[in-house]
C-alpha cells in the first residue's frame, strides 16, 4: 500500500472518530458506564493514532491494531445493546408484537438508532486497513 493511501485511511479514521466523539457528547451518550465505552475508545483511537503517525514502530502498530479490534467489537456489542433496548421498548408499547413485526419496529426505531454503533465497526476496519502490510510490521531483510 502506498504512503498516500495510508495517509488517506488515517485521515478518514480520524475525521470519523472526531465525528463520533462530537455526536456522542452532543447527544448525551454518557448516562452510565457502558455509554462511556465508545467515547473512551474513540479518544483512545485518537491517542494511539497520533503515536502511530509519529512513531510507526511494530509495537505501536500492534497497539493500534488492538484498539481497532476493540472498536470493531464495541460496534457489534453496541448494535446488540441498542437493538435490545428497542425491543424492550416496543414490547412495552405493544405487548402483542412478535416475530418480524417486532424485529422491524426495533431495527427501525429512531432512539436509540439500532445500527448507529456500526460506525465504530466501520472505523475499526478502516484502522486495520491502515496497518495492512505496514512497513513497520514487515520483516527486515539483512543484506
Model features per residue range: what roles?
Residues 43-64:
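Canonical alpha-helical transmembrane segments
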Residues 6-11, 58-73:
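Interfacial segments of alpha-helical transmembrane regions
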Residues 2-7, 24-45:
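Transmembrane alpha-helix entry/boundary detector in multi-pass membrane proteins
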Residues 70-92:
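C-terminal TM-helix exit segments that contain a strictly Trp-centered aromatic cap at the helix terminus
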Residues 14-16, 36-50, 69, 73-76:
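Core segments of alpha-helical transmembrane spans in multipass integral membrane proteins
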Residues 27-36, 86, 108-116:
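Membrane-helix interface and helix-disruption motif detector
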Residues 94-137:
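Alpha-helical membrane-associated segments of multi-pass integral membrane proteins
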Residues 1-14, 133:
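Cytosolic juxtamembrane helix and N-cap/initiation of the first transmembrane helix
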Amino acid at each position: 500500500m502506498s504512503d498516500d493511501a495510508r495517509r488517506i485511511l488515517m485521515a478518514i479514521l480520524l475525521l470519523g472518530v472526531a465525528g463520533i466523539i462530537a455526536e456522542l457528547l452532543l447527544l448525551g451518550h454518557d448516562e452510565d458506564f457502558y455509554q462511556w465505552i465508545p467515547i473512551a475508545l474513540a479518544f483512545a483511537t485518537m491517542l494511539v493514532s497520533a503515536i502511530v503517525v509519529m512513531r510507526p514502530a511494530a509495537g505501536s502498530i500492534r497497539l493500534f491494531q488492538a484498539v481497532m479490534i476493540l472498536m470493531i467489537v464495541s460496534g457489534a456489542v453496541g448494535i446488540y445493546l441498542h437493538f435490545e433496548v428497542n425491543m424492550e421498548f416496543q414490547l412495552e408499547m405493544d405487548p402483542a408484537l412478535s416475530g418480524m413485526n417486532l424485529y422491524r419496529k426495533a431495527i427501525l426505531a429512531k432512539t436509540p438508532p439500532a445500527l448507529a454503533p456500526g460506525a465504530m465497526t466501520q472505523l475499526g476496519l478502516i484502522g486495520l486497513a491502515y496497518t495492512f502490510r505496514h512497513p513497520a510490521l514487515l520483516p527486515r531483510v539483512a543484506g
